[in-house]
Amino acid sequence: MDLAANEISIYDKLSETVDLVRQTGHQCGMSEKAIEKFIRQLLEKNEPQRPPPQYPLLIVVYKVLATLGLILLTAYFVIQPFSPLAPEPVLSGAHTWRSLIHHIRLMSLPIAKKYMSENKGVPLHGGDEDRPFPDFDPWWTNDCEQNESEPIPANCTGCAQKHLKVMLLEDAPRKFERLHPLVIKTGKPLLEEEIQHFLCQYPEATEGFSEGFFAKWWRCFPERWFPFPYPWRRPLNRSQMLRELFPVFTHLPFPKDASLNKCSFLHPEPVVGSKMHKMPDLFIIGSGEAMLQLIPPFQCRRHCQSVAMPIEPGDIGYVDTTHWKVYVIARGVQPLVICDGTAFSEL
């Protein structure tokens, strides 16, 4: 109303000004055409300008969206350094063929025989290269050249006298032995839903799982608003994480302070055995297939046996790392999900 009244008053004043200009023009002897031209120029210069229409609600919506976009962009750049690295790029067609030809050439080498997935056993020593795993025995160790009369050093007794035990869940020991390596076949792999839940709840305890920013946020949104690692989060209860992801540990003889470090997503290598992943004393196969290798210290190799055995989803392994070096090799077609931790709080 005020704007309309203001415009009316302006036009009234302009009308009075036009009449005054017309009278003055006639008095000065100007022609009618010259007077009209002068009035037209006057009106064009003094025409009131109507301000553009304003939509306050739309402006508020624009500001809110711009603020949210800025917050998400800032959060992304803050989180990105703490996110796991993306997997290696897929090889092009030319690289794939070159890798295949290189793989075929390597198959003829003697060292390649011990990593061949077609063999049921993994030979680790000299003349036993062609020795397969027995069908009834899930693991195999190589024969070491040991002199019975030669005394065993004190730091080699752990690997020389405590051999790897492979057992079913119902046969698991009731008492935990620190020096005794063992593999417990639970037959309980991680389901995809359990892995996804773990990724949402504990993103800082994962490695190698690559997923887009918004895809991960959308998948975890109802359960968790911010499913990404951030530095100001309080320390995780890793013992609780272990038993939450693997409830079977409540029935096993491991110490109560056994904890979970991280879960990793590993791709099988084009050349079987070309990449070995070092493990701590406690590890669990969530999904996929792998080969376990236990190698004694160099000074103990005359008294201790190297061990190699295939492990499968649901297998729980424990090895005292003071007497063994523990390695896992991803094999097969499916990616390997493996979780590692420790049975002792001091590690």
From Swiss-Prot:
GO terms for cellular component: cytoplasm; Golgi membrane; midbody; nucleolus; plasma membrane. Residues 1-58 are cytoplasmic. GO terms for biological process: autophagy; chromatin remodeling; collagen metabolic process; connective tissue replacement; epithelial cell proliferation; fibroblast proliferation; positive regulation of cell cycle; response to bleomycin. Glycosylated. Keywords: Cytoplasm, Glycoprotein, Golgi apparatus, Membrane, Nucleus, Signal-anchor, Transmembrane, Transmembrane helix. It comes from the Eukaryota. The chain crosses the membrane at residues 59-79. Residues 80-347 are extracellular. Homodimer. Interacts with BRS3. Interacts (via N-terminus) with SIN3B. Exhibits histone deacetylase (HDAC) enhancer properties. May play a role in cell cycle progression and wound repair of bronchial epithelial cells. Named amfion, after 'the 4 Amfion heroes in Greek mythology and their deeds in different locations within the mother land. This is Bombesin receptor-activated protein C6orf89. It comes from Homo sapiens (Human).
